[in-house]
């Protein structure tokens, strides 16, 4: 019986702390007049930018070689 009361007391304490943190966060948001800031994560943004840059560069290079090959075959100068 004592261990059950003890565990319920711990759960109540943790719930109270969690609730008070949520209330503080909500109050802090209300002080900012409801402005929501968007935070970008650095690693994923960096990876996304790098893949786009590599994709554009490879696309241009492959496009040039493909066009040169087609022009060569059309003019029979290969």
Curated annotation (Swiss-Prot):
Annotated keywords: Amphibian defense peptide, Antimicrobial, Cleavage on pair of basic residues, Disulfide bond, Secreted, Signal
Record-level GO cellular component terms: extracellular region
Cellular compartments annotated: Secreted
Gene Ontology annotations of biological process type: defense response to Gram-negative bacterium; defense response to Gram-positive bacterium
Nucleotide-binding as UniProt keyword: no
Tissues showing expression: Expressed by the skin glands.
InterPro entries: Antimicrobial_frog_2, Frog_antimicrobial_propeptide
Signal peptide: 1-22
Pfam families: Antimicrobial_2, FSAP_sig_propep
Propeptide feature ranges: 23-39
Disulfide-bonded cysteines: 72-78
UniProt family annotation: Belongs to the frog skin active peptide (FSAP) family. Brevinin subfamily.
Function: Antimicrobial peptide.
Name of the protein: Lividin-4
Native organism: Odorrana livida (Green mountain frog)
